[in-house]
């Protein structure tokens, strides 16, 4: 009886310590901090990929990368799960024309506070580069088709 209580208490402690480590995400999604992430291995244009992500979850968008730590998490998740594809991966960054000014912003509306561009050019949408093991960004034409990653704010 004493051993049962001890083991039960130990399992409870482990469960409680793990439950605060990330977001509560659906079973086929990965979590980092308070967000949920899903790799989608379907080829879509940037616009179609963003639409797909918005249909998967409330406030779902193509992934925004807001810090170096998040960039490392995303790159490692992609490297572990995308081994054979020759395609780059859409992220939620795009160039927006606002009147006569252009600015880059994430599809979820968050500001660009972290950047890891290969070379800026006039193309409007951004991918994570397969050749860099998904650690650098490059802008490409939005009409190209790539696989992509979705992100949404999970529940705690």
UniProtKB/Swiss-Prot annotation:
Q: Which residues form the signal peptide?
A: 1-23
Keyword entries, A-Z = Disulfide bond, Hemostasis impairing toxin, Platelet aggregation activating toxin, Secreted, Signal, Toxin
Source species, domain of life: Eukaryota
UniProt cross-references to PROSITE patterns, sorted A to Z: C_TYPE_LECTIN_1, C_TYPE_LECTIN_2
Q: What is its main location?
A: secreted
What are the GO MF terms of this UniProt record? toxin activity
Q: Which Pfam families match?
A: Lectin_C
> What are the cysteine partners in each disulfide bond?
25-36, 53-150, 125-142
- Summary of the tissues where the protein is detected: Expressed by the venom gland.
C-type lectin domain residues are 24-151
Q: Where in the cell is it found?
A: Secreted
Listed GO CC annotations: extracellular region
- Gene3D superfamilies recorded for this chain? Mannose-Binding Protein A, subunit A (3.10.100.10)
Function summary: Weakly agglutinates platelets at high doses by binding to GPIbalpha (GP1BA).
Family, according to the entry, reads as follows: Belongs to the snaclec family.
Fill in the misc note.
Monoclonal antibodies to glycoprotein IIb/IIIa, to bovine vWF, and to bovine serum albumin did not show any effect on the binding of AL-B to platelets.
Summary of subunit composition and partner proteins = Heterodimer of subunits alpha and beta; disulfide-linked.
- This chain's protein is named Snaclec alboaggregin-B subunit alpha
Q: Which organism is it from?
A: Trimeresurus albolabris (White-lipped pit viper)
């Amino acid at each position: 009886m004493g051993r049962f209580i001890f083991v039960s208490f130990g399992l409870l402690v482990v469960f409680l310590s793990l439950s605060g480590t990330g977001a509560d995400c659906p079973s086929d999604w990965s979590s980092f901090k308070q967000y949920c992430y899903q790799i989608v291995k379907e080829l879509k244009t940037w616009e179609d990929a963003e639409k797909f992500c918005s249909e998967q979850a409330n406030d779902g968008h193509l992934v925004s990368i807001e810090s170096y730590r998040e960039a490392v998490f995303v790159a490692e998740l992609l490297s572990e799960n995308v081994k054979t594809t020759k395609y780059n991966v859409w992220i939620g960054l795009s160039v927006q024309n606002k009147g006569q000014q252009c600015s880059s912003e994430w599809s979820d509306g968050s500001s660009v506070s972290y950047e890891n561009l290969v070379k800026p050019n006039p193309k409007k949408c951004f991918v994570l580069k397969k050749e860099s093991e998904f650690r650098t960004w490059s802008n490409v034409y939005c009409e190209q088709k790539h696989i992509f990653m979705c992100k949404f704010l999970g529940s705690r």
